[in-house]
Amino acid sequence: MHLNAAAGWIHLGDYDSANDELEKIRAEWRAHPDVLDLRWFIYSHHEQWDACLDITSAIVKMAPDRVSGWVHKAISLRRANGGGFENAKALLLEAAKLFPEDGMIQYNLACYCAQLGQLDAAQEYLHKSYELGDARQIKLIALDDEDLKPLWDGG
């Protein structure tokens, strides 16, 4: 009940109410990956990247088969103290071996490579994400993604 309510509040953009709902969950369930996943959305909204990294590290450890855990961990690692694009890319390269058919990982690798100035690799990862996902939708998202701007600027 509280988990669904928290997800609803997040969908509506009310992160404080979402957090209030998560606090109502019994203590023994608060470390469940589903709860932690929602907690990540709240903390990422508030740009608490070190805490986000702790959360996603726990998710990946408990549920290594969750692609979103790996992607969110890379996003957190990119922004956390001592993180950065290189570390986030390295993590996603590891995840890509586990999930070779996941377009979200390929897309994020494209973003990190673009930011690192590795434009040929970025283009390859982006095309791979088109092949694995909804190419039309991904292209629309990619055109507005600041991380991919180096590709559109002619690199």
Role assignments for model-derived ranges:
Residues 136-155:
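Terminal, low-structured helical/coil segments at or just beyond the last alpha-helical repeat
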Residues 3-4, 34-38, 68-72, 104-108, ...:
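Alpha-solenoid helical repeat scaffolds
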Residues 29, 63, 99, 133-136:
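A structural motif in tetratricopeptide-repeat
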Residues 1-34, 38-45:
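Alpha-helical segment of the N-proximal tetratricopeptide repeat
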Residues 114-115, 119-137:
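TPR/TPR-like (Sel1-like) alpha-helical repeat modules
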Residues 37-49, 54-104:
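Alpha-helical adaptor scaffolds
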